[in-house]
C-alpha cells in the first residue's frame, strides 16, 4: 500500500546529529509514512548510529541505501526520489530535526487546500540563539518565482516543504548532478514554476541546525565559485528554455551580483579574488540600475560598491600586466 509521505534523509559523516534527527522523524503524530536513508559513503559512525537507532522503532517503515563512494548531494537526492513510494515527499537534512506534528500539519494542509507544495516556517538554530524565520508564499505564481530567485523572503531550501511526488519526480525537476551547492534552490525555483498551488502553514515546524557551522562555511574556496557559476548557468538555461528570462532579468541580475559580492567578501585568498573578479562582468556595469530593487540595504550597497570597484581595478591591472608581458615577449 502506498504511504502518504516519504521522508528522505541523505547523510554523510553526521554522527554527532543523526540520532536526534531520526528520533524526531520516528516520533511523529502522523503514522502513514516511510523513511528512507541514504549513506553517501560516510567514513565515521553515522551508518552504525542509523542502524542502531532505527532498530528501536521496529513498527515504522525504514529502509537504508548506501553509495559505494561519495557521490554528492544531488546524486543522493535523485536516488532517494527514485526509491520513494509516497504520495508526498519531505526531505530532511541529517543534522536537522522536525517538530512532532510536522507531517500531520503539512499533510492535512496539503489535502484540504489541494496544494502541490506546502510550506512551513523554520526554527533557525544558531550557536547562541534560536530564531523563527518566516517563509513566504505570494498570491501569484509570478511573485512566488521571483521571490524564490531572489531568496529573500522565500527560503529556497527543500526541507520545510511537503511536495507532491509527481511534481518533484518530473524529469525537469531532477537534481543537476555535479551541482552540490544550491542544488535545492534550483529545484525549488523549478517547483514554484510548475506548481499549480502552494499553501503556507504559519508555524515553525523544521529545526534548521546552524550550530555546526565551521569556518569554511564563511571562507569561500574555488569550489564555491565554480558551484555558483554552475548554478547561475543552469538557472539561466531553465529560464531561457521557458521564455522567462526577460521577465525575471532584474531579479536574476541583482542576485548574481549580490552572490558575487558575498563570495568576494569571504574569499580565502587574493588569488581567488583576482581570478574571479570578472565574474558576471557583463552585468556588473548595470549594477547601479539594478540595486534600487532593494536599495534599503545600505550596508550591502556600500560593500558592493567597494568590492566592484576593487574588481574593476584588478581587471585593469591584470590587463596592464598582459600588455607589458606582450611587449617584453616581442623584444
Specify the residue positions occupied by each region the protein language model found.
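Hydrophobic transmembrane alpha-helix bundles
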Residues: 77, 98, 102-106, 154-161, ...
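Residues within HEAT/ARM-like alpha-solenoid scaffolds
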Residues: 247-255
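Nucleotide-sugar donor-binding/catalytic module of glycosyltransferases
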Residues: 1-231, 327
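Catalytic core of nucleotide-sugar-dependent glycosyltransferases
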Residues: 203-211, 218-246, 258-288
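Membrane-interface aromatic/basic loop that binds lipid-linked glycans or pyrophosphate carriers
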Residues: 268-331
Amino acid at each position: 500500500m502506498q504511504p502518504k509521505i516519504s521522508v528522505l534523509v541523505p547523510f554523510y559523516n553526521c554522527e554527532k546529529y543523526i540520532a536526534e534527527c531520526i528520533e524526531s522523524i520516528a516520533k511523529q503524530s502522523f503514522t502513514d509514512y516511510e523513511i528512507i536513508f541514504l549513506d553517501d559513503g560516510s567514513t565515521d559512525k553515522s551508518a552504525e548510529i542509523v542502524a542502531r537507532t532505527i532498530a528501536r522503532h521496529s513498527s515504522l517503515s525504514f529502509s537504508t541505501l548506501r553509495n559505494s563512494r561519495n557521490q554528492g548531494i544531488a546524486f543522493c537526492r535523485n536516488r532517494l526520489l527514485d526509491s520513494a513510494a509516497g504520495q508526498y515527499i519531505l526531505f530532511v537534512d541529517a543534522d536537522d530535526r522536525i517538530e512532532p506534528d510536522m507531517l500531520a500539519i503539512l499533510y492535512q494542509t496539503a489535502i484540504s487546500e489541494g496544494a502541490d507544495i506546502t510550506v512551513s516556517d523554520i526554527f533557525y538554530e544558531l550557536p547562541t540563539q534560536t530564531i523563527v524565520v518566516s517563509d513566504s508564499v505570494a498570491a501569484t505564481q509570478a511573485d512566488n518565482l521571483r521571490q524564490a530567485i531572489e531568496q529573500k523572503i522565500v527560503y529556497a531550501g527543500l526541507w520545510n516543504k511537503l511536495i507532491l511526488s509527481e511534481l518533484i519526480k518530473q524529469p525537469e525537476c531532477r537534481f543537476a548532478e555535479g551541482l552540490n551547492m544550491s542544488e535545492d534552490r534550483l529545484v525549488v525555483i523549478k517547483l514554484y514554476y510548475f506548481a499549480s498551488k502552494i499553501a503556507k502553514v504559519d508555524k515553525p515546524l523544521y529545526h534548521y541546525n546552524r550550530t555546526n557551522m565551521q569556518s569554511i562555511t564563511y571562507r569561500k574556496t574555488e569550489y564555491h565559485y565554480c558551484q555558483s557559476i554552475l548554478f547561475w548557468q543552469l538557472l539561466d538555461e531553465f529560464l531561457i528554455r521557458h521564455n522567462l528570462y526577460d521577465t525575471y532579468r532584474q531579479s536574476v541580475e541583482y542576485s548574481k551580483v549580490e552572490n558575487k559580492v558575498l563570495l568576494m567578501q569571504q574569499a580565502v585568498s587574493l588569488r581567488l579574488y583576482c581570478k574571479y573578479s570578472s565574474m558576471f562582468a557583463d552585468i556588473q556595469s548595470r549594477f547601479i540600475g539594478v540595486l534600487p530593487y532593494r536599495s534599503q540595504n545600505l550596508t550591502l550597497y556600500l560593500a558592493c560598491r567597494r568590492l566592484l570597484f576593487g574588481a574593476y581595478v584588478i581587471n585593469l591591472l591584470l590587463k596592464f600586466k598582459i600588455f607589458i608581458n606582450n611587449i617584453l615577449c616581442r623584444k
